[in-house]
Amino acid sequence: MPEHAPDGVRPARPHHKLTADGRRMREVLTYSRRGSRFSPRQQQAWAAYAERWWVPDEAVDDPGFTLAGCFERSAPLIVEIGSGIGESTVALAAARPDHDVVAIEVWRPGVADTLGRIGAAGLSNVRLLSVDAVWSMAHLVEPDSLAALWTFFPDPWHKAKHHKRRLVTASFARLVAGRLAPGAEWRLATDWADYADQMVEVLDAEPMLEGGVVERWAERPVTKFERKGIAAGRAITDLAYRRRGAAR
């Protein structure tokens, strides 16, 4: 069962971790926190919807926090890592009203945009967290429970010296495989060829998963990041990996 870290540690936010003597702990993160200034439209969306659909970091740090407790019902759970401005989140969640969707995004203007999209679409099955995705998968998601995981256009960390910060690694693949329900899918997309190659190498090597490169997922809308990649001349790669075992 997932467990929170001991009292006094802010586990969901590695950039806040301290050593025993109070010094800031250096962590290898899979994300970077970009600017947090809101546009007037984003500020309006945040004011209107954040209290309803965004889970504060301090709430996630509470030892009694659960993802199920974020919703007013019991439903199959989907997690999206790196939801950006919510284009995929809202479209895919709207098509799955019987599922609950937790979108993890640390960029607050993107969260605000997503909140606005949720409100405009009239959805009630999406919640947003702005905490570390790797920690969240390990400590908030129950084993064998996820109905699906979506990871579209994760930060490519394209410089070789930064590859260690990429999200899709062997250890993360093993973690995800153990959190997916049997038969559940992990959908990924990237516009960086070398990251796509790394994803295939890592995920093919995980014995609990099966899959590979697939045709573009028709349900996934063309997002801002995808358009940017196409404009730069980069090919888009979609991948789908399934947790081995009979679907429930």
From Swiss-Prot:
> What's the catalysed reaction?
guanosine(46) in tRNA + S-adenosyl-L-methionine = N(7)-methylguanosine(46) in tRNA + S-adenosyl-L-homocysteine
GO CC list:
tRNA methyltransferase complex
Q: Which UniProt keywords apply?
A: Methyltransferase, S-adenosyl-L-methionine, Transferase, tRNA processing
The role this protein plays is:
Catalyzes the formation of N(7)-methylguanine at position 46 (m7G46) in tRNA.
Q: What is this protein called?
A: tRNA (guanine-N(7)-)-methyltransferase
Annotated family: Belongs to the class I-like SAM-binding methyltransferase superfamily. TrmB family.
Q: What is its EC number?
A: 2.1.1.33
Q: Where does this protein hold S-adenosyl-L-methionine?
A: E80, E105, D132, D155
**KW DNA-binding (keyword) present:** no
